Amino acid sequence: MASELFATYYPRVVEAAQQLAPWQIAAGVTAAVVIGGYIWIITELRSPRRTGTSLFKLSGGGIKKHDVAKFMDGYEKSYKTQEDGALTWHHISKEDSVKMVNTFYDLVTDAYEWAWDISFHFSCRPVWANFAQAQVLHECRIANLARIQPGMKVIDVGTGVGNPGRTIASLTGAHVTGVTINAYQIKRALHHTKKAGLLDMYKPVQADFTDMPFADESFDAAFAIEATCHAPKLEQVYAEVYRVLKPGAYFAVYEAVSKPNFDPKNKRHVEIINSLVYGNGIPDMRTWKEAEEAGKKVGFKLHFSYDAGEASSVLAPWWERPRNLVNTGVIAYTKFAIKVCDKIGILPRDYAKFAKCVGDCIPDAVESGELGIFTPMYVYVWQKPEKST
């Protein structure tokens, strides 16, 4: 069959090529090389755990296609610049803030799964590991820090589509409940969990992590990976985790915070942090010290804290992967492709605006790491005190 097709169509292709001008042939070859090169680059850089979601099938998650433009307009208007130059949400009510986080994840979930990984976090990579392995190691560390053991009831605070929760449940034998505000992420989490055969070990629950539908003292341990930064106030989510944990239980967190090197009087520092806030749906950027004070304020005992991004000098930095995406042109090409698909109606109208919002912050994330002014993985290991006898 293949030989027959070749015999039939090859002469026609050659004949058609002979009728083309040299510049047309050169343009065609160049286009083929560029497109083929891009496909190879993004295949190499994307996680081997990527999903089947296509660039041309990115959606607004739980937002209907014709409503994406309206929600994007609301997202843009949600931010304002303070007198000190810092970008923050101007919402007065917690309800509005929660709504905007939900909107952000409606818009970004498909893109994260397609272009990043099914674990929505950064990680530092050992030289012998690939990206997916580094992600798993990052998740294993927090399970160890939270003292998770077989049979425990554990809560994953801000679970996304659930991959860290599934990883930790698989490796520890614990039963993990993952909480996310976003209904579309619940749908995706259930899809992945069923596919992994872990429905009896990991359960996603749609809820606001500042107001969870669980009884007091009902969990043996808790962890959060780059998620609590989305809370309107850190005290609100930390207090709720404190409530649902049993006395003596541990809560381990990777918190996204600015570091001591951040200078609020440095214009470039402020621009970078503002970009991270806007491109990641964060109410505002907390400092490492503010996160520490928030946990202590609600009653937790702090065992220790450190920046996991600086813990070892032999690991590739957490910004290695985004730096590769920028340097290879994947970010620029993807934004361009999404813009074209937006214009011709393949993607929801104004989805390109959102892609630009997220894509523009990636070079700034790299610079924030290189300057040492931000980390997505400041470790805090908290413990709820035992009840006094």
UniProtKB/Swiss-Prot annotation:
The record's similarity note reads: Belongs to the class I-like SAM-binding methyltransferase superfamily. Erg6/SMT family.
Query: Broadest EC class?
Result: transferase
The keyword Acyltransferase is annotated on this UniProt entry: no
Q: What is the membrane topology listed in the Swiss-Prot or TrEMBL record?
A: Single-pass membrane protein
One Pfam family named in its UniProt record = Sterol_MT_C
Q: In terms of one coarse class, where is the protein primarily found?
A: membrane
Compartments where found? Microsome membrane
Task: Spell out the molecular function terms from Gene Ontology.
Answer: S-adenosylmethionine-dependent methyltransferase activity
Q: What is its EC number?
A: 2.1.1.-
* Keywords attached to this entry: Endoplasmic reticulum, Lipid biosynthesis, Lipid metabolism, Membrane, Methyltransferase, Microsome, S-adenosyl-L-methionine, Transferase, Transmembrane, Transmembrane helix
Q: Which InterPro entries match?
A: Methyltransf_11 (IPR013216), MeTrfase_SMT (IPR030384), SAM-dependent_MTases_sf (IPR029063), Sterol_MeTrfase_C (IPR013705)
Species lineage? Eukaryota, Viridiplantae, Chlorophyta, core chlorophytes, Trebouxiophyceae
Q: Which GO terms describe its biological process?
A: methylation; steroid biosynthetic process
- TM spans (from-to): 25-45
Q: Which residues form the signal peptide?
A: none
What is the protein's species of origin? Botryococcus braunii
Q: Name one GO cellular component term.
A: membrane
Q: What is this protein called?
A: Sterol methyltransferase-like 1
Q: What does this protein do?
A: Unable to convert squalene, botryococcene, cycloartenol, zymosterol or lanosterol to mono-, di-, tri- or tetramethylated derivatives.
